Amino acid sequence: MSYLAKNYNRKKISFKYGKGSFLYSTNGKKYLDFVQGIAVNSLGHAHPKLVNAVNKQSKKLWHVSNAFQIPEGEMLAKKLAKKTFADYVMFQNSGAEATEAAIKVARRYFYSIGKPKKNRILCVKNSFHGRTLAAIYASGSKKMTEGFGPKVGGFDHFEFGNHQSLKKKITKNTAAIMVETIMGEGGIKVIPDWCLRELRKICNKKNILLILDEVQCGIGRSGDFFAFEKSKVKPDIVPIAKGIGGGFPIGAVLMNKKVASGMTAGTHGSTFGGNPLAMAVGNSVMDIISNKKFLKNVKSISEYFLSNLKKIQNEYPKIIKEIRGRGLLIGIELKTDQTKFIKKLMDNNLLTIRAAENVVRILPPLNVKKNEIDQSVKIIKKVCLELN
């Protein structure tokens, strides 16, 4: 009997250890892990520089209250600010906390300038921003909110890719538009660059803040440090998590000077956010991923992967409907049963995970090797042949 709550439908497999792109199960099997904790282990399992960072910091200081200065946090905040649009950073522990904090930052900004009624957040219907109460109501998904009433108010929703739907939902009380630059759980849907630029124009015209959720698609996952960079758009607020910790729990809200002005002492806090252990790991991750050569390689390997997947799609059009994504955030939309496909991949020692719209989500580590991509392509092709 397991004493864990039943809120996960766990597969009957557990792992003893991981190394790089691979996981080793307790029953002695080796798996190519293209889930990586759902885009968390950005540098694979047990990366030596991250292991060293944890070991080194663990011998000095694990935790200290944010009532005091934390040099490791100051260092990571500076690196993030220098690399991005941000002027200020506020650390959390997870993606859901980061999106919740982003909502607070947006509402608090308008409150601080004498517009307390300007507090509504406009989001994409059936998006994903986390599992906390505000985050599930921000998603606009009945599946996520069922049974968790009363409703958390202050959110409006528009259809993905429908600018007319968006414009109709904007009111004088709209504080921010919050979207995932690439929808992950929603089926690997990339918001086009022109669309992001249009969102920025709308926000500028209507005095609305732009929040771009990069919890899953950020920190090099797209081939750029942030997925929105290609569009040249500057958001006001960006929540991040997952990849910045390389497997260690870290979340953060990046914000410009204007919106940060509302976050005065006492307006938000986090007991564990920005702790020295997490910051030590985050600094190591930043040093590796922010390197131009590293990001260039992510783009190169992802182009190679996508081209090979599209060849499989052309060979098995009855199985694969579409290959989509950017960088190493890839979706295979199927014409066949998703659960069965993922199970067959797993039977062939390749781990993947589902997304909405019958999509198989593929999330290799950003430092994945070419021969590991080749191995995965071979397995995917084999499964397509079996199901054809």
Question: What are the functions of these language-model segments?
Answer:
Residues M1-N388:
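Conserved N-terminal phosphate-binding loop of PLP-dependent enzymes in the Aspartate aminotransferase
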